[in-house]
Amino acid sequence: MKLEFTEKNYNSFVLQNLNRQRKRKEYWDMALSVDNHVFFAHRNVLAAVSPLVRSLISSNDMKTADELFITIDTSYLSPVTVDQLLDYFYSGKVVISEQNVEELLRGAQYFNTPRLRVHCNDFLIKSICRANCLRYLFLAELFELKEVSDVAYSGIRDNFHYWASPEGSMHFMRCPPVIFGRLLRDENLHVLNEDQALSALINWVYFRKEDREKYFKKFFNYINLNAVSNKTLVFASNKLVGMENTSSHTTLIESVLMDRKQERPCSLLVYQRKGALLDSVVILGGQKAHGQFNDGVFAYIIQENLWMKLSDMPYRAAALSATSAGRYIYISGGTTEQISGLKTAWRYDMDDNSWTKLPDLPIGLVFHTMVTCGGTVYSVGGSIAPRRYVSNIYRYDERKEVWCLAGKMSIPMDGTAVITKGDRHLYIVTGRCLVKGYISRVGVVDCFDTSTGDVVQCITFPIEFNHRPLLSFQQDNILCVHSHRQSVEINLQKVKASKTTTSVPVLPNSCPLDVSHAICSIGDSKVFVCGGVTTASDVQTKDYTINPNAFLLDQKTGKWKTLAPPPEALDCPACCLAKLPCKILQRI
């Protein structure tokens, strides 16, 4: 009789014991020297995983009793990394982070281990974001990782308006010529306008003028001067005085300026590249006058006072929420004829005009507030049913593709007003909740730290309004809460609230702001409002119509301006500020 027995995980058992022997310096027959550190290992193990070691053994005709010594330059691989590599060779396990991925790639290159290179490639793909895409592109070019290079390049192209801004330019000025030229040549480059592209080129050249002046002539050809404002053209002309062999470029600039003096003024928008960004307010979903739920997505182009339809949502809903992050708009929740609180979540790609289904929210929500902070999408508060409020703050984890509970507000509320400060803090200001059995807005400010998941500061103040307030930071530590009946300045440092005489005028249709309106701050103390319910003071609350107009409030003057009317009058639509690429205008 014959029986075969197989040990479970025997290979792992053997390698674990060999690794213990390595660390105890037992039975070693090779050593790796890095700086003043010596690491002992077994030739057979490393020869099995590294073609480099196998080649050294065979080319030197090493005998069984011979010992192999390898000296590694510490400027190429650190002792810490060599120790990590040896652990990986013996166990097949490695922990990759943004801090060690470059050295691990060097190790994979040095020892010629393609499996480790694949792991590093996968890590870079999964962890890429706006903050690291420039560094990742450098790594991809250095180690010839095409997939990473393509994704990182797209990240830089889609966020060029950030990298060319004062906030991001400190790192971007070190961009290699081959990458910088490729970006300027890209028609889909996401610049604020062609002025930013020309200014970025000049600043990039002057950052290392002696080395980069030779690239100016070639890169200048990628700029459409007809799309550049007179002010920036004059700025560029003055800068060219400090460069050699730029007389022809100066002549081109002067020619454009001269032509403009002789022709009728026209919008520069028609000359912008396809990727140039338009500040826009995007309206999604809502309920129509006869009760039908809407799935339309409309954009108001601020610069042109123009409405256009972008797309149709994958579902019809009102009281949903939306926020933008880069080229994407995220939507979630809402109510329909059948379901009062939807869990569904979607992402709209403004560049490709396409929708992607996201994992559902953990609970169905209406009147929640979506917001983007530090490039991450959050959902704040909301209702799961009439008079049932939640305090949950959810975060969407792009890498794991899941909604996570990030923390909780101090009070369960819906219809909250939220403003961000920096890349870390959310200020959640007032909201609706049950007070002594009645739905009421409460005077509370929660400072939520997205890094720790805690409400690090909670301030309460007497509230005399039940309308949705407008928020702004007039000074670094002064949060302004403006409403129709009462306005408050909250000193976050002194934890003190003070009433002010400034108030928000009611809408031109004599209605106050509430959760049914689409409200969006668009910068420069201006606030966009459209849709919502219109009620008159001399009729019962049940008699209402839907506001068919759009308005713009200048908070500096306290006056409303009537804008171009939206395509449809909608109650409780979602609303967010977004930067749309110019190419969408070609759809009109």
Swiss-Prot record:
<dbReference type="InterPro" id="IPR048070">
    <property type="entry name" value="Calicin_BTB_POZ"/>
</dbReference>
<dbReference type="Pfam" id="PF07707">
    <property type="entry name" value="BACK"/>
</dbReference>
<dbReference type="GO" id="GO:0007283">
    <property type="term" value="P:spermatogenesis"/>
</dbReference>
<dbReference type="InterPro" id="IPR011333">
    <property type="entry name" value="SKP1/BTB/POZ_sf"/>
</dbReference>
<feature type="domain" description="BACK">
    <location>
        <begin position="133"/>
        <end position="235"/>
    </location>
</feature>
<dbReference type="GO" id="GO:0030154">
    <property type="term" value="P:cell differentiation"/>
</dbReference>
<dbReference type="GO" id="GO:0043161">
    <property type="term" value="P:proteasome-mediated ubiquitin-dependent protein catabolic process"/>
</dbReference>
<dbReference type="InterPro" id="IPR015915">
    <property type="entry name" value="Kelch-typ_b-propeller"/>
</dbReference>
<dbReference type="InterPro" id="IPR017096">
    <property type="entry name" value="BTB-kelch_protein"/>
</dbReference>
<protein>
    <recommendedName>
        <fullName>Calicin</fullName>
    </recommendedName>
</protein>
<comment type="function">
    <text>Required for both nuclear and acrosomal shaping during spermiogenesis.</text>
</comment>
<feature type="repeat" description="Kelch 2">
    <location>
        <begin position="328"/>
        <end position="375"/>
    </location>
</feature>
<keyword id="KW-0880">Kelch repeat</keyword>
<keyword id="KW-0217">Developmental protein</keyword>
<dbReference type="Pfam" id="PF01344">
    <property type="entry name" value="Kelch_1"/>
</dbReference>
<dbReference type="GO" id="GO:0031463">
    <property type="term" value="C:Cul3-RING ubiquitin ligase complex"/>
</dbReference>
<dbReference type="Pfam" id="PF13964">
    <property type="entry name" value="Kelch_6"/>
</dbReference>
<keyword id="KW-0221">Differentiation</keyword>
<dbReference type="GO" id="GO:0033150">
    <property type="term" value="C:cytoskeletal calyx"/>
</dbReference>
<dbReference type="Pfam" id="PF00651">
    <property type="entry name" value="BTB"/>
</dbReference>
<keyword id="KW-0744">Spermatogenesis</keyword>
<feature type="repeat" description="Kelch 5">
    <location>
        <begin position="476"/>
        <end position="525"/>
    </location>
</feature>
<keyword id="KW-0225">Disease variant</keyword>
<comment type="subunit">
    <text>Interacts with CYLC1; the interaction may be relevant for proper acrosome attachment to the nuclear envelope.</text>
</comment>
<dbReference type="GO" id="GO:1990756">
    <property type="term" value="F:ubiquitin-like ligase-substrate adaptor activity"/>
</dbReference>
<dbReference type="GO" id="GO:0005634">
    <property type="term" value="C:nucleus"/>
</dbReference>
<dbReference type="InterPro" id="IPR011705">
    <property type="entry name" value="BACK"/>
</dbReference>
<keyword id="KW-0206">Cytoskeleton</keyword>
<keyword id="KW-0597">Phosphoprotein</keyword>
<feature type="repeat" description="Kelch 3">
    <location>
        <begin position="377"/>
        <end position="423"/>
    </location>
</feature>
<feature type="modified residue" description="Phosphoserine">
    <location>
        <position position="149"/>
    </location>
</feature>
<feature type="repeat" description="Kelch 4">
    <location>
        <begin position="425"/>
        <end position="475"/>
    </location>
</feature>
<dbReference type="InterPro" id="IPR006652">
    <property type="entry name" value="Kelch_1"/>
</dbReference>
<feature type="domain" description="BTB">
    <location>
        <begin position="12"/>
        <end position="124"/>
    </location>
</feature>
<keyword id="KW-0677">Repeat</keyword>
<feature type="repeat" description="Kelch 6">
    <location>
        <begin position="526"/>
        <end position="580"/>
    </location>
</feature>
<keyword id="KW-0963">Cytoplasm</keyword>
<dbReference type="InterPro" id="IPR000210">
    <property type="entry name" value="BTB/POZ_dom"/>
</dbReference>
<dbReference type="GO" id="GO:0005737">
    <property type="term" value="C:cytoplasm"/>
</dbReference>
<feature type="repeat" description="Kelch 1">
    <location>
        <begin position="280"/>
        <end position="327"/>
    </location>
</feature>
